[in-house]
């Protein structure tokens, strides 16, 4: 047997030879082209097939000319609201009342239509229609001007109308309109309402309306000054936003010379009425 020292020396020589062989193999370049290697030294995966350079045709295909972007600033819209379509009871007679507003146009210029009135099973007591041009002069307010035609009571009257309408602070919807008729007869009307959301669908709507006249009109039993006022509360439930039945109550009162004309004709000067109706828009 070989001495222990000789065996140790042979083992060391074999180890050194193996190390040199591995180093030589590592120094020999790989036969696989770099672009076909699957991973870099850091371990990042590389594509097997090289990526061709980006051309102008590639850019044009990725970003085609889409033309102008469509806008809606010139589009014509329309809206119709039956704010009141109701049956009233509790006064001298049972009546059906309506109050409808509609418009057609854009964000700034609109053509407005308003109509309201009262009828019973026998005849039309009150009825009027207004055609107005409206122009927005701020984000929340419109200027309106046009014509109003009174159908009832007799005799019929035609008025020039001018006013403003919009959303006041605290979200009160307001309409204030002045009217000028024949022989410089003047009238004015102020309306305001507010929507209180009890829930997202149950809404309480207080509303007030005041009417004034510049001078007496005996033919229509209207005195000068404050002629009449109406306050009301309506509670509606919106099954859909476009359709909501409601119940409510209203208080009507006549003042001054208008009240005198009513008393002379045997009519009451104030009344409390209960209301059932439908509010709808489209």
Model-predicted segments: where are they?
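Outer-membrane beta-barrel initiation region
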Residues: 2, 22-123, 127, 134-135, ...
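Repeated loop/turn-to-beta-strand initiation elements of outer-membrane beta-barrel proteins
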Residues: 108-112, 139-143, 170-174, 199-204, ...
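Extracellular loop and loop/strand-boundary signature of outer-membrane beta-barrel proteins
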Residues: 116-119, 148-150, 161, 176-178, ...
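Detector for outer-membrane/organellar transmembrane beta-barrel domains
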Residues: 157-218
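Transmembrane beta-barrel strands of outer-membrane/channel proteins
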Residues: 84, 113-117, 145-149, 176-180, ...
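Outer-membrane beta-barrel "beta-signal"
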Residues: 233-238, 268-282
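Residues that define the transmembrane beta-barrel architecture of outer-membrane proteins
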Residues: 76-78, 94-98, 125-129, 156-160, ...
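Residue-level signature of outer-membrane beta-barrel architecture
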Residues: 104-106, 135, 166, 180, ...
